[in-house]
Structures are given as structure tokens and as C-alpha cells.
Swiss-Prot record:
Reactions this protein catalyses: Hydrolysis of DNA containing ring-opened 7-methylguanine residues, releasing 2,6-diamino-4-hydroxy-5-(N-methyl)formamidopyrimidine; 2'-deoxyribonucleotide-(2'-deoxyribose 5'-phosphate)-2'-deoxyribonucleotide-DNA = a 3'-end 2'-deoxyribonucleotide-(2,3-dehydro-2,3-deoxyribose 5'-phosphate)-DNA + a 5'-end 5'-phospho-2'-deoxyribonucleoside-DNA + H(+)
Annotated residues for binding of DNA: H104, R126, K169
GO terms, biological process: base-excision repair
Record note on quaternary structure: Monomer.
Name the UniProt record assigns to this protein: Formamidopyrimidine-DNA glycosylase
Keyword tags: DNA damage, DNA repair, DNA-binding, Glycosidase, Hydrolase, Lyase, Metal-binding, Multifunctional enzyme, Zinc, Zinc-finger
Top-level taxonomic group: Bacteria
Free-text remark on how the cofactor is bound: Binds 1 zinc ion per subunit.
Active site residues per record: P2 (schiff-base intermediate with dna), E3 (proton donor), K58 (proton donor), R286 (proton donor)
Organism: Rhizobium etli (strain ATCC 51251 / DSM 11541 / JCM 21823 / NBRC 15573 / CFN 42)
Amino acid sequence: MPELPEVETVKRGLAPAMEGARVTRLELRRRDLRFPFPDALAERVSGRTIVGLGRRAKYLLVDLDDGNTLISHLGMSGSFRIEEGAASAMPGEFHHARSKDEKHDHVVFHLEGGGGPRRVVYNDPRRFGFMDIVGRADLSAHPFFRDLGPEPTGNELGATYLAERFRDKAQPLKSALLDQKNIAGLGNIYVCEALWRSHLSPIRAAGTLVTSGGRPKQQLDLLVASIREVIADAIAAGGSSLRDHIRADGSLGYFQHSFSVYDREGQACGTPGCGGTVARIVQAGRSTFYCAACQK
């Protein structure tokens, strides 16, 4: 499933083609994805101007000029593709011709303005993605967002905040980090990588990073810094291209070439002087990769 860096990369890739454009028609080629489309979705979006693109956790947000926001989740295999309706190239770094099987094109944004007519196509072979529309003022109260924790790159995330969340918790550290109520948008790949960078075991209790008085230990400061770094590095690299993720320009992300532990079972740990080997275990049905020699 695309994680925060992948969705951020898609948002940045779509922005030059979508922001400021008018949706002449929203074409729905089926009645549902993972869930049924909201009633009259095509009518509510058609004719509107896109005033901005945003992201919250793993959700792409398309702000419209009538005060509504279209919410899109990529699910397991969803992606967007930009198609020009004229010969002139679209601005921005992310632009590519058609790149996926058209039989899985389920939603088409027909756009005009700026560089001329164009289409932004949502393609989803597995159909685990979904879309919804809600008033922008009501976004924080929407069931998708009301319980989300702070963004991993935002100012709200700090060691003191995590100490409050983790205090007295016997829950494994990795599970606590994947809990979207604690931190929004973190997923399996980047949690594994952040834990390796901070030399923390995914199986240790989250509460062990907090003093008896409720203050964060130094290791928690290092963990927060590692989370910020790994997310920033992944966004800069365009995300990871594992399995179905693809950028808005049709190319692949390159952060997977920088993995230190994820999907590296049996390989040597990259920590200088460690000498350990990357192991794979299963936690809550998900693969965890870590080095037992240097992650404590």
C-alpha cells in the first residue's frame, strides 16, 4: 500500500496539471471502487475549479472552488496518470504518457485551463482505493480524519508528545508507530527503516522509551529525528516502487534502492561495525525487518 511519501509524491506530480484547472467533466466508469462512489459525485465535481491539492496522512485531497474537498485513497494499487489533450508539454517534473492497462481506468478528470485540455486518469487494478467528497470545513470531523495523529513531518510530533502516547504501554514499538492515532501516515516500510536508523528494536515495549516520571528518554528524541529523516529522504527520492506504486509521471520511485533493512532478510546489517544480519519476523500479520544485533 502506498505510504505517506508515495502519496506526497503523487500530489506534487499532479499539482501542475490539476491546480487551477476546471473540471469540465468527471467520468465514473463504474459504480464503485472499494466502496460505492458518493451520490451524485460526478455532478458535484463537474464544472468546479480545483483550487489546490493537499495531503493528510495517506489521503490525497482535491480542494474545489465551492468549498468541498474530494478525498482519494490509492488503496493497494491505485495511481493517477496525466494525459495531454494538446501538443504542448505540461509544466512540472511529473508528466508521462499512458502507462497502464486502460481496462483498469475507473475515474477520469476531464480538465481545461492553463495548458489546454487534458485528462487525469485514476487507474486501480485491485480496486481497493476509494473516493469521497465532504465540505472542507468538516474535513477534520470526517471518519477518515477525526482520530488521526499528527503528521510525522509536522511540528506537533516530538518526543514529549510520543512520551505521552507511549507511557506505560506494553505494546510493541513498531505496532505503536503504525497506529494512525499516534502518528498519521507512517507505514510498514518507513517504520522499519526509522527503527533501524535509531537502533531500536521493533519488538521492545513502547513504554520503555519513557521514564517513570513520564518524560521521554534520549532514545525517543533519536526516534523522532529518524522518522523525520527517513520520510524526507523518501519524498526526495520519489517514494518506493514496491509492487504497485508508481509516480504520477508513470516512473518508479527510487527510495527502495536505499533500504537498509526492509526486504533485506539475510543480508549484512549496514551499521558500521555491527556485523549482524537482517532478520524477518511477522508482527500483527506484517513482515518486520530489523537487525537484532544493533537494534535493542
